[in-house]
């Protein structure tokens, strides 16, 4: 009998019933509610009937309002600047509690950072939320986004109707060079397979380079598996995973811990497991990445040049390059190192963990030269609360000017006051660089935290390896 992949094992563990149409009923361990896709189940949205159906279980039903508020200025400032004046998404989320959802003590940070760090989501679980980047929740778990109608279905039944996806493995072997991070790995993968390469697949990252990453780095990979077209991103459980969970507030204790660990160690793909698609990269060949266009797949190493549409034989791709260059205000064959940066954003569910802030601070440390112009605005939107950052020894960066504050989505997307002005170029550690993503006419370049900090220091994109070796 052929071996099973990690995805196969997680699916089989939670499959309640296989239906005649090929879909299955899957049991859901955790559902997260947030202010964009969840209040509608109470009829909070205009034109939607109020639903009186109750909940299947009083299991922990965490609720977060991440998207609409600016992290800068504190709670009162955030409430004044909600995306819809007069609306309080948090209030609408609290209304969902009337359906007998038991809420939890707030996690110390926004959803994709605070919850794994608190041990609320554990290996072997199924986790869903009305947010595509739910895949961040996290290694050894089956986590993905769902739609608003599915949010209601899970609340009512504790199950989800789904069709099993194909299996895809991205294997990265070797040791990462200095200055190259998980963000560079996943951008290089997307540059290789495109934003549709993982469509219909559950994507598992594997290989010695992946095992060498921290848990925070693995979360970055799982987060951006979505930009590769996959619905799920996963990394197998290993001793690093178990050490990360141990001692967390909501992790099992005593005999329950020993039993859980024995089960978690089985959450790896078997040696003879078959994958529908396998992509292989050599870690030593990956360089710091920068997106130059309006899609995550429009990405190149920092020491290369923007592509020339004249060299593209495919007319569809050629037209796409032309449009992207026009929107981004770039010229064909322009060195990426000549692209000037107006803003720097270090945050989002992709790169806002302590490790990311430290990587940026290490690059920016002592950088007080005239190049650090006051025109370049840093916005740090940390994924963990201020108290938790202090407990982990984070003291912040001395670089100025820097805006920093509460946790939240901030400038990742233009649905709160943190946004770009038209024509501004932003070195961003977020996950999407579509037209207008960070503000109408704003030009987003996706990079790692270290590369973002290097751009802030130099005022343009530079190879962070040069700064680290200096």
UniProtKB/Swiss-Prot annotation:
Function according to Swiss-Prot or TrEMBL? Catalyzes the isomerization between 2-isopropylmalate and 3-isopropylmalate, via the formation of 2-isopropylmaleate.
Please give the cofactor(s) recorded in the UniProt entry for this protein: [4Fe-4S] cluster
Q: Which family does it belong to?
A: Belongs to the aconitase/IPM isomerase family. LeuC type 1 subfamily.
Q: Record's Pfam families?
A: Aconitase
Q: Which NCBIfam families match?
A: PRK05478.1, PRK12466.1
Key words of the record: 4Fe-4S, Amino-acid biosynthesis, Branched-chain amino acid biosynthesis, Iron, Iron-sulfur, Leucine biosynthesis, Lyase, Metal-binding
What's noted on cofactor binding? Binds 1 [4Fe-4S] cluster per subunit.
Which PANTHER family has this protein been placed in? 3-ISOPROPYLMALATE DEHYDRATASE, HOMOACONITASE, MITOCHONDRIAL-RELATED
Q: Which cysteines are joined by disulfide bonds?
A: none
Q: Where is this region: Disordered?
A: 50-121
Which domain of life does the UniProt lineage start with?
Bacteria
Query: Known InterPro entries for this protein?
Result: 3-IsopropMal_deHydase_lsu (IPR004430), Acnase/IPM_dHydase_lsu_aba_1/3 (IPR015931), Acoase/IPM_deHydtase_lsu_aba (IPR001030), Aconitase_4Fe-4S_BS (IPR018136), Aconitase_4Fe-4S_dom (IPR036008), IPM_dehydratase_rel_enz (IPR050067)
Protein's organism: Azotobacter vinelandii
Q: Name one GO molecular function term.
A: 4 iron, 4 sulfur cluster binding
E.C. numbers: 4.2.1.33
Positions binding [4Fe-4S] cluster in this chain are: 349, 409, 412
- This one is known as 3-isopropylmalate dehydratase large subunit
Q: How does it assemble?
A: Heterodimer of LeuC and LeuD.
Q: Report the Gene3D superfamilies cross-referenced here.
A: Aconitase, domain 3 (3.30.499.10)
Annotated GO biological processes are:
L-leucine biosynthetic process
Q: State the SUPFAM superfamilies in the record.
A: Aconitase iron-sulfur domain
- Catalytic activity line of the entry: (2R,3S)-3-isopropylmalate = (2S)-2-isopropylmalate
